[in-house]
């Protein structure tokens, strides 16, 4: 039984790729057709590959993997944070700081500073400091929380990284590749799939599409951690007979 049904993918607009002039030819095998200057992703492949991604993440979680969710574009930021938290994992949903993985020691020092500032406030140290200094500390904390809050409690560099839009998150993907960290990603028609270990061909620009895929991978983590079938919403709907028929009946725009 598929983790995500064709109907769910269609309703979320997962099939809408980029304009044909913006495509990456390496994504050709995941493209079904072209309509009105837009590439249409082959959802039959997305269904199959989403299953594989689910199994990969579930099995990693079952082995106590640390999983980092990455999505810094506005369409992804909320879903990435919410689903990572729900799965008890970690996230980066604002700008990726160069060296987050490859210079983990330095990042840990910045996280330690964030925790120190929080501790100062909790212990009442702020009350003893001049208002100007407190304002500067609050500003520093806000900035550190924005960029590092999602990995504040991450015990080590991740064992697996899930990425929304590897085209935008090229630096993150390169760092993971350098360290041998497998990458699971939503890959749109403009991206290079070569550096992605587990590909999910999908529209990564629509909020609903990002939420759908990301939530399913969070379900995979939860199931893996529980060591048994989690209470996840497996797709019950029958698959459509023909993707060509589906393309004809679905209308909508790429962006949610």
From Swiss-Prot:
**GO term, biological process aspect, one:** translation
Under the heading InterPro entries, the entry gives: Ribosomal_uS2, Ribosomal_uS2_bac/mit/plastid, Ribosomal_uS2_CS, Ribosomal_uS2_flav_dom_sf
GO terms assigned for molecular function: structural constituent of ribosome
Q: Which Gene3D superfamilies match?
A: Glucose-6-phosphate isomerase like protein, domain 1, Helix hairpin bin
- The answer to whether UniProt assigns keyword Magnesium to this entry is no
Q: Which keywords does UniProt give here?
A: Ribonucleoprotein, Ribosomal protein
Q: Which GO terms describe its cellular component?
A: cytosolic small ribosomal subunit
Spell out the family assignment given in the record's similarity comment. Belongs to the universal ribosomal protein uS2 family.
PANTHER family reported in the protein's UniProt record: 30S RIBOSOMAL PROTEIN S2 PROKARYOTIC AND ORGANELLAR, SMALL RIBOSOMAL SUBUNIT PROTEIN US2M
Q: What is this protein called?
A: Small ribosomal subunit protein uS2
Give the species: Streptococcus agalactiae serotype Ia (strain ATCC 27591 / A909 / CDC SS700)
